[in-house]
Structures are given as structure tokens and as C-alpha cells.
Amino acid sequence: MVISAEKQTVILKMAADFNFYGKRLRATKLEVCDDISKMVYDTTKHSTAICDWLEANKPAKPKAAKVAKAIKNDERPEAAGIVSSTVEQWEVKQGKRFIITSIQNNTFPHKNFLASLEQYAQFIGADLLVSKFIYNKNGFQNGEGADGIRYDSAFDKYICNKNVFLNNRRFAFMAEINVLPTADYPLSGFAETATALNLEGLAIGAAKITAESVPALKGEIVRRMYSTGTATLKNYIQQKAGQKAEALHNFGALIVEFDEDGEFFVRQLETMDESGVFYDLNTCATPAGCYETTGHVLGLQYGDIHAEKLDEECAAASWGHGDTYGLVDILKPKYQFVHDVHDFTSRNHHNRASGVFLAKQYAAGRDKVLDDLIDTGRVLESMERDFSQTIIVESNHDLALSRWLDDRNANIKDDPANAELYHRLNAAIYGAIAEKDDTFNVLDYALRKVAGCEFNAIFLTTDQSFKIAGIECGVHGHNGINGSRGNPKQFKKLGKLNTGHTHTASIYGGVYTAGVTGSLDMGYNVGASSWTQTHIITYANGQRTLIDFKNGKFFA
């Protein structure tokens, strides 16, 4: 079939209109040619010939005109490399106090929070340092490559572009690190970095507030890692990663202060709303200024107590000793939260089958459960304050007493030092059962009725909720999801919690975990350890911070 030149032009135009060359299948192309044949020849019998002709005469695509590239002066070196680590070149910024945070490119500041940070930095004589991170650099006007990256000018005088040490070479602000705000765990991989660089502490700028403790060999310092939170608004790509991250965005910063020995103390600063207001200990920072305040601390959760193995120095700094004041007297919290108050050392299920352990307890005069109870009760008595209600969160070590009393293999006839107490407490348990008293707590009973201690604490039961400022404080952390072992990372799915159990201070999402008030060496923690003596402060606005005990104090 011969197609005239006039009809060829018409057929090519119609093929373009019907996207003939965009069809992959021959059958689909023939359907298009049926329509073309009908319109050009008033019959479909020429569709095959038209299809063959179109395939043989596909128009060539016009070549795009080449745009001449602008010639740039490339000042990059041809090669580089050093033998020593760059850490040796990091500047040491002098000063006693620093406030550090981060900002995102092409993003407005949280103006009130920035104003509060500036006010607080001036109030305490701190340097304000800001690191930068890049995200979604092509999502803004003129955003092709580095030329489109902008940071709000309000931060210009605070920008820190290089990794620096603060005060001394033990704590580093790694301001060069670019951590995407969508990262689930901003500190992932930096534990090895801290160890390799011999850093005792490090902080990186990130949109999330997190904290981790790096395990150390026995007798060595547990390294601490922090991410700052950010002083810029939420600005995320509304896809899966962005929407996940947006929900966990923290308007936050860290205060890092140093004592005369160069020891660092870090606390989290976070504003919970558009006001920009935040607390640090007894100071309230606002965009208009800072002032001392009271009645703003809802909760002080101590690191796990373990009364029989208590660190007396940490305890004295926490709730005082004799005529001395402790942290509780400074903060005056509405509630004190106590985890693992009782260690149950003398007959703990981990050791009571060991003849060597029992012999050591006997030789030390510590083989009586009653003595453990008295120690525990005395600790609770020393915590008593008129302004604060003590809450005992039921914990695995607290439950060790009832586990012993219900253990058919306890062989109490071979334990005369504890036989009378064993039977007395069991009698109380069975009496409560007979009375259908579901609220009976054998540890509470033993401390008050047997050990003769007087205190006004409330004992929670396992799974009993106790919330302050929307934060669950009734979970110790030993029971995980669906019968598994508890783990702070696992608890992220449960919302905002303050937990204990691990003796390892951390922040993962809405889960803050305290350390320990007891000794850092309890005998059974053999090998490397990430334990720290760390409490949790919860403010009335829902803001929280970890607070560490070092050098006999909680702050510089």
C-alpha cells in the first residue's frame, strides 16, 4: 500500500496525538491504527499497513542544545591525607558553661526558644554554640546544591562549624557531624568513636534529644554521649521517614558545665510548646528573662536504690544525711520515685544456693533478712519530706522477698537465722489471702510491722499506672512486651516513660532511664559496665532531664 505524502503528514500527526510510539504491544498499536485508518480512509482495513509504515518511519527526536557550563575556579586539592588523627587539631574552647544546640538549613528558628536560650546564656555566663545540619536541600527556592543552602541569620553569631573541645580535652562538641533529622538513633556508631578518641563525653547536633552510656571495663570511666535537640522549627518531607521523625522532634539544647577539676555535668533543656520557656534546676528561662522559681518540679526519680548496697556519698547528695541537705531539698519535688529500694542481698535467689556466698554473709554478720529490711526502712525514713510524697515503684529486687517466701526449695529448716521471720511473713501473706485482701504488699508489711520503720511511702503494684505531666512513672523496666525482657529501646513504642532497672542512663524517644544510687560495683556485675549514678528530674511542663552524680555533687 502506497500512502500519499499528504496523508503521511496527517497520519504522523494523529499517531503523535494518540501516543502511538508510547505503546509497547503490537496489539495496542493496531487499535490506534484502526482509529487512524477509519478517520483517514473511512475503513479499518488499512490499519496493518499504517502500523507497519509508522514503525518504519518513526520521527527522530530533536537533539537538545548543549548549555555551556560555567567555568569555576576549583580550589580543591588533588590529594590529601594525614598520619595523626584530626582530633589533635580540634580547638579547646575555654569557659565554664556552654549551651549547645543545632539548626536545620532553610528553616525558621523557634524564635521564643532561641530568645530563652540567649537569656539563659547571659544569666549564667555561658557561651551559646550552634551546629548545623542539612536536610532536603533541593526542596527550596534556588536549592540546587550548596548554593541554595541557607541558615537563619538569627544564629550567625553562634555558629560552630568545627569539632571542638569544651573547657578541656575530655568533652567534645562534634559540630561537623551532619545527622539527618530522620535518623532513628542519632548516636548510632559513635560509641566506638568516643572510645577510639579517648573522649569521656561527646555531643552532636541533631533534631532529637537522646543520650547513651558507653560500656567500660571495670574501674574505667563510662563514656557519655548526647544529641542536642534543635532550635529550628519542624520542617520535614511529608513521606514516611519525615512524618516519623516529625513526631519525635525536640526543641532542645544541652547545658554543659564544668567544675574546678574539669569534670563535666550535662543536663537537657527543652521547651514543650510555642512559649519557648524551659527549666534548668530552679531557674525558669523565658524570652523576656530568667528567674529563680519553686513548685515547678513534679518528680525526682532516683537511680535504683539497692539499700543494702547503697553508695553513701551519692545518697547523702541525693536526700541528705543528718543535718545536710540533698538534691531533693533543693528541687522540692512533689513526688520522689524509688526503684529497687530493697536489694534482698542476704537471701537473693541468685546466690542463696551457694555455700560460699552464705558463708561470706555469715562471716560478715549479714546473713539475716531482717537486717536487710531495717537498712531499707532507714533509707525510706531518711527520704521523708513534708513537701514530697515518696512512691515505691514495684521492681524485680523488691519482689525477691516474696519470691523467697514462696520458694518451696528455700530449705528454711536449714536457715535458723531467718526461720522465724520467714514463717511470720508467710503467716501474714496467708492471712491476707484468707481476708481476700488483694492490696497486701509483703515488703510494705515487713518494713513497717516487722522492721519497725516509719515512713509515708506509697507502694505501687506491678502494672499500676502513676502518671505525672503525661509521663508514666509506674514502670520499673524489668518486664518487657509480651513476656520479653524489658529494654528502653523497646519501650519507645509505649510513649513517654521514666524507667529504671538497667542502671544505665539513657534517653530513647520518650523513654528516660535512670542509673543507680547504689554502688557501681555490687559484686554480681562482673566485666564491662555502663552503669552510672544518674537521676531523672521531671518538671511541671513535661520537660525532663538526666542529672549525674560526679565528684560528690550533681552540678558544677
From Swiss-Prot:
GO biological process: one example: degradation of host chromosome by virus
Keyword annotations: Bacterial host gene expression shutoff by virus, Degradation of host chromosome by virus, Early protein, Host gene expression shutoff by virus, Host-virus interaction
Induction: Expressed pre-early in the viral replicative cycle. Expressed with a few other proteins from the first step transfer (FST) DNA. FST DNA corresponds to the first small portion of the genome that enters into the host cell at the beginning of infection before pausing.
Origin: domain of life: Viruses
Glycosyltransferase recorded as keyword: no
Further comment: This gene is part of the long terminal repeats present at both ends of the viral genome and is thus duplicated.
Function: Involved in the degradation of host DNA and the shutoff of host genes and phage pre-early genes. Together with A2 protein, involved in the second step transfer (SST) of viral DNA into the host cell, which leads to the complete entry of viral DNA into the host cell.
Subunit architecture: Homooligomer. Interacts with A2 protein; the two proteins form heterooligomers. Part of a complex containing the host RNA polymerase, protein A1 as well as another viral protein of 11 kDa; these interactions are probably involved in the transcription shutoff of pre-early genes.
Record's protein name: Protein A1
Organism field: Escherichia phage T5
UniProt gene name: A1
